[in-house]
Amino acid sequence: VGFKAGVKEYKLTYYTPTYETKDTDILAAFRVTPQPGVPPEEAGAAVAAESSTGTWTTVWTDGLTSLDRYKGRCYHIEPVAGEESQFIAYVAYPLDLFEEGSVTNMFTSIVGNVFGFKALRALRLEDLRIPVAYVKTFQGPPHGIQVERDKLNKYGRPLLGCTIKPKLGLSAKNYGRAVYECLRGGLDFTKDDENVNSQPFMRWRDRFLFCAEANYKSQAETGEIKGHYLNATAGTCEEMMKRAVFARELGVPIVMHDYLTGGFTANTSLAHYCRDNGLLLHIHRAMHAVIDRQKNHGIHFRVLAKALRMSGGDHIHSGTVVGKLEGERDITLGFVDLLRDDFVEKDRSRGIYFTQDWVSLPGVLPVASGGIHVWHMPALTEIFGDDSVLQFGGGTLGHPWGKPPGAVANRVALEACVQARNEGRDLAREGNEIIREASKWSPELAAACEVWKEIKFEFEAMDTL
């Protein structure tokens, strides 16, 4: 048979530097840190093997299949600048290894086992190229950016949101009141916090009812379409769907899900329901930093963002850039483009390892939230552009005069920035001046400017190239 038992080096089978990648291959870029003494080719080949057809020894059933057709291949290795013992291993996977329309299966294959592998000290999945043939097996976001704008009748500016705080402990009625005040003041959206599900102090059904009431009341008074992200995340998929169905029955425009803690299977089911029933879907990335914070181990957020676009969501939290370092800005804008655009060119300076063609998959709105306030508005408008959601939690609710004036301050600041931009002014250079001018006409904005003039969150960026 030519079958020879025993252990053989991975690189004999799985390191193929002459391989020409196919248009249908899923391509992965791994940052590999091998154990001392393990050569790069062997480590790269081990990653390819253990995440596809390989196992630690030769098995006779290998003879019953065509390894050449099904094996992952490490086809290129390059050193990481400034790192002694790290390199980028590029691996190509044949499309047949993956179930159609299943992000769950894709991740189980590519990152399921190999991250615990002893020959490696650390491993990080930096990027994935999803071939068009695989993209087409996914529904993707329930609606996408254009449909959302049409549903909301809001054009030519970023959308404004606010997370209701304190996130835990309010009764449903007080919570609904906070929602109403923010929406009434001029915000487009308010948001359940990611850990607001159905706790003893506020059961989900009560919250949904009071928030729907707040939604309708604020719409009637302002003449604008409003939304509150009702968090449907639950302990079981059935319970999650029950909440989504109830939201639809209330006639609200949008629900929400924590896609990493809830899981991709649950998320994809919910996304399908949302498209079929006209609900927008807001996605929170709770737990992402557990996976993406370490520079040498885990999965970079741009991969989790791509996976979400495949699984389905209309909004996703994507960091703020503001008040942090410049290096982070390019990387963040890299995955923001991957969320929004149809076609994204390879650009290593922005952390994009592969050209990605999304064909006709709808786009996702990036959500900037976390530690931002009115002084950040010019920078946020300039960095994220119109197709984004800017979310101010404390930056709305912390206003010295209360929530409605806090909402007014944010809306005035945003409208001023958009108008200044449309008049050709430079938001990056004149931002503070633009806000100051606007605050002369808005006492609410002036009060907000006074409160937050000194607040900064200055730390070194973790996410550098």
UniProtKB/Swiss-Prot annotation:
Gene Ontology molecular function: magnesium ion binding; monooxygenase activity; ribulose-bisphosphate carboxylase activity
Site (Transition state stabilizer): residue numbering on this chain: K324
Reactions this protein catalyses: 2 (2R)-3-phosphoglycerate + 2 H(+) = D-ribulose 1,5-bisphosphate + CO2 + H2O; D-ribulose 1,5-bisphosphate + O2 = 2-phosphoglycolate + (2R)-3-phosphoglycerate + 2 H(+)
N6-carboxylysine carried by residues: K191
The protein's enzyme class: lyase
Post-translational modification: The disulfide bond which can form in the large chain dimeric partners within the hexadecamer appears to be associated with oxidative stress and protein turnover.
NCBIfam families for the chain: PRK04208.1 (NF003252)
Protein family per UniProt: Belongs to the RuBisCO large chain family. Type I subfamily.
The protein's name: Ribulose bisphosphate carboxylase large chain
Organism: Cornus canadensis
Lineage: Eukaryota, Viridiplantae, Streptophyta, Embryophyta, Tracheophyta
Gene symbol of the encoding locus: rbcL
